[in-house]
Amino acid sequence: MRIYNTLSRRKEEFKPLEEGKVKMYVCGPTVYNLIHIGNARPMIVFDTVRRYLEYKGYDVNYVSNFTDVDDKIIKKANEEGVSAEEISTRYIAECKKDMEGMNIKPATTHPLATQEIGGMIDMIQTLIDKGYAYEVNGTVYYRTRKFAEYGKLSKKNIDDLEAGHRDEAHSLKVTGEDEKEDPLDFVLWKPKKEGEPSWPSPWSDGRPGWHIECSVMSKKYLADEIDIHAGGEDLIFPHHENEIAQSEAANGVPFSKYWMHNAFLNIDNKKMSKSLGNFFTVRDISREYDLEVLRFFMLSAHYRNPVNFSHDLMESAKNGLDRILTAVDNLRHLSENAKDVIMTEDEKKIIASIDDIYKKFEDSMDDDFNTADAISAIFELVKLANSNSSSDNSKEYIDTLMKKITTLTDILGLKTDKKEEMLDEDIEALIAERQQARKDKNFARADEIRDELLAKGIVLKDTREGVRWSRA
């Protein structure tokens, strides 16, 4: 198995630090709103990486955090007149609903930044003691130039960097830039401002900088040195670069052996942004498609290639997924009435020929998790099943064919189990209850009903003429 390592900029043979075990950390979302489809890509991609590693026999300790203290969370809380904790708790719950819809397995651990403040204070103190950090007026900064290998992940030369040369969306804006020893130094701890959550520390009542959070949670729930650290390519600099500087200075060992990053997602060939009106949450997509279609769409491209999201491409993904699900459904129906006899020699030959398709699938996944080519192998298997199955076949043969397909779809996290169909009158009754909830301004219950129907494959569309529904 070969993985493209951002650190070396080449594919490397995958050899975990401990045989048979994989320690994997994936940067999770900042929970101040519903997750958008850009957030969904790393969730789906690295969940699939995890599933394939488990299929290969590895014991995967998969840690993915929730950033539950951040400027955006505080801003949202102040706008709504509630606590930051209330905002983060609400959107963690909503995020988990979306993750379930996309069939993303719960992480081994989902740590919360606010629950790990003690560990962050300890690591910051270690960095101060080692001379890698310093305190000024209650703020603690990291001495960027002291870490000789700074820039090794992003391939940025520290001498070419200028203050402010950081992703604007992720920059930690701290007043008093002139108090830094060097403009490139970044914040580890900042003093509280009015209306912000804070924690006591040796330097000031305040809160941690964003970068220190992942260094500490990775250390606590995995180890000082881990196998895979992953996230979107927008995190390479400054977030992951700063994590390396913190962790390696504090712990004295390499932070992660392999670094994996997924490419950006565009909408109709444009960057997704609220100002362009092309911003979609996962919940938005769920109103038109089963979220399994979104998962299939994301896996139809290699994770390191940019993905272009459009309605036409989602329709294409829906049709592709339907081909697979229909094949499994047909086999399921054949199995119910098939003869309970042993396989014939001809049937055994067909099953044996599937080994070649499995090899194609595994070769694709072993080559830096090429899910696009892996899906092509599944389509090849579906074609074989469609043209070599009938009511004349044995039950053992039909069941084996079906199992061969579902083993591969399970690796990609694509569910093939049949959804129980709701009766029309039950659907109409729930829609009526939803309409009443909206009249009563009980929007939480209205959303709950819509999500409940969606989970059963029923898509609602609000129109001027009333609510229309269809089966996904």
UniProtKB/Swiss-Prot annotation:
Q: Which cofactor does it need?
A: Zn(2+)
Superkingdom of source: Bacteria
**Which catalysed reactions does the entry list for this protein?**
tRNA(Cys) + L-cysteine + ATP = L-cysteinyl-tRNA(Cys) + AMP + diphosphate
Signal sequence residues: none
Q: Quick one: which residues bind ATP?
A: K274
GO terms, biological process = cysteinyl-tRNA aminoacylation
Q: What's the main place this protein lives?
A: cytoplasm
Q: Motif ('KMSKS' region) spans which residues?
A: 271-275
* One Gene Ontology term of the molecular function aspect: zinc ion binding
**Mind naming one GO cellular-component term on file for this protein?**
cytosol
So where does Zn(2+) get bound? C27, C214, H239, E243
Motif 'HIGH' region: which residue numbers?
29-39
EC no. given is: 6.1.1.16
Q: Where in the cell is it found?
A: Cytoplasm
What are the annotated disulfide bridges?
none
Which CDD domains would you find in this protein's record?
Answer: CysRS_core
* Top-level class of the enzyme under EC nomenclature: ligase
Which terms are listed as keywords in the entry? Aminoacyl-tRNA synthetase, ATP-binding, Cytoplasm, Ligase, Metal-binding, Nucleotide-binding, Protein biosynthesis, Zinc
Cofactor note as given = Binds 1 zinc ion per subunit.
HAMAP family, A to Z? Cys_tRNA_synth (MF_00041)
According to the record's subunit comment, the protein's assembly and interactions are:
Monomer.
What family does the entry list?
A: Belongs to the class-I aminoacyl-tRNA synthetase family.
UniProt protein name: Cysteine--tRNA ligase
Report the source organism. Lachnospira eligens (strain ATCC 27750 / DSM 3376 / VPI C15-48 / C15-B4)
